[in-house]
């Protein structure tokens, strides 16, 4: 991902304020509510029968934290996202058979959640930088797909 120095600073400054537990759980939960067909990958998570069930599901929250921790790791390696996410790309492609479009959807949901959490601090410039990052991460995760 090519970010200007200003964009990198904006991404890093905001990310320093992110509560990975809360934001991760909310982002994954929203993905499952807004795009219900994505739930098929999480059937082992138990009750996903309603928006409140999804948003309150401890397995959704725990996996959301895991997802956002990996995203956080990616922020430390913006110059090598494909390398950083190679193993996860392989896992999601070969073993889990996740549609790579879901990575783009989750990235966009993450941007919505960040805007929700940070309000005025999530300026159009910050959003622009984050859109580049989530697109780069989605592309890296889709890299191993044939």
Curated annotation (Swiss-Prot):
Sites bearing N6-acetyllysine, chain numbering: 59, 82, 144
PROSITE patterns: GLOBIN
Entries under InterPro entries matching the protein: Globin, Globin-like_sf, Globin/Proto, Hemoglobin_b, Hemoglobin_oxygen_transport
Entry's transmembrane regions: none
Sites bearing Phosphoserine, chain numbering: 44
Positions where S-nitrosocysteine occurs in the chain: 93
Key words, A-Z: Acetylation, Heme, Iron, Metal-binding, Oxygen transport, Phosphoprotein, S-nitrosylation, Transport
Tissues in which the UniProt entry reports expression: Red blood cells.
GO function terms (MF aspect): haptoglobin binding; heme binding; hemoglobin alpha binding; metal ion binding; organic acid binding; oxygen binding; oxygen carrier activity; peroxidase activity
Annotated heme b binding sites: 63, 92
GO BP field: hydrogen peroxide catabolic process
Record keyword Transmembrane helix present: no
Phosphothreonine: residues carrying this PTM: 12
Modified residues (N-acetylvaline): 1
GO cellular component entries: blood microparticle; haptoglobin-hemoglobin complex; hemoglobin complex
Phosphoprotein listed as a keyword: yes
SUPFAM superfamilies referenced in this protein's UniProt entry, alphabetically: Globin-like
Top-rank taxon, per record: Eukaryota
Subunit (UniProt): Heterotetramer of two alpha chains and two beta chains.
Annotated family: Belongs to the globin family.
Name of the protein: Hemoglobin subunit beta
Gene giving rise to this polypeptide: HBB
